[in-house]
Amino acid sequence: MKLSPKDNERLKIFMAAELAKQRKDRGVKLNHPETIAYISNWVCERARDGMDVAEIRQEATSLLTREDVMDGVPEMIDMVQVEPTFSDGTKLVTVHDPIRGDTREQVE
């Protein structure tokens, strides 16, 4: 199987995001790289599903809370930028302040 550099990067994001999801599901707090991968993968998958950029930006801020990540991680991530492929091409998606609530109830 031959992968382009972009496909190789996407595969790495997916693998890191899957590890992050498993850890989150077990109640393990995510570190900085896991958090970035988790959000980035979600953004790429929603783009693939056909969501528009505005919807993705809005919903991505409710994926994780301070309860889900290690201390200090929310302060280290003021934005996440990803270039997913949409049906009409690749677009830059910027999610500002992706970790907003302290608890799940505050986000919902």
Curated annotation (Swiss-Prot):
Class of this enzyme: hydrolase
Entry keyword set: Cytoplasm, Hydrolase
Residue stretches in coiled coil: none
EC number(s) from the headed UniProt entry: 3.5.1.5
SUPFAM superfamilies: Urease, gamma-subunit (SSF54111)
Pathway(s) of this molecule: Nitrogen metabolism; urea degradation; CO(2) and NH(3) from urea (urease route): step 1/1
Lineage: superkingdom: Archaea
Pfam families on file: Urease_gamma (PF00547)
A cellular component term, taken from the record's GO annotations: cytoplasm
Keyword Cytoplasm: yes
CDD domains linked: Urease_gamma (cd00390)
Reaction it catalyzes: urea + 2 H2O + H(+) = hydrogencarbonate + 2 NH4(+)
GO MF terms held by the record: nickel cation binding; urease activity
Localization terms from the record: Cytoplasm
InterPro entries registered for this protein in UniProt: Urease_gamma (IPR012010), Urease_gamma/gamma-beta_su (IPR002026), Urease_gamma_sf (IPR036463), Urease_subunit (IPR050069)
Biological processes per GO annotation: urea catabolic process
NCBIfam families: PRK13241.1 (NF009712), urease_gam (TIGR00193)
Entry's family note: Belongs to the urease gamma subunit family.
Oligomeric form and interacting partners: Heterotrimer of UreA (gamma), UreB (beta) and UreC (alpha) subunits. Three heterotrimers associate to form the active enzyme.
Name of the protein in its database record: Urease subunit gamma
Gene (name only): ureA
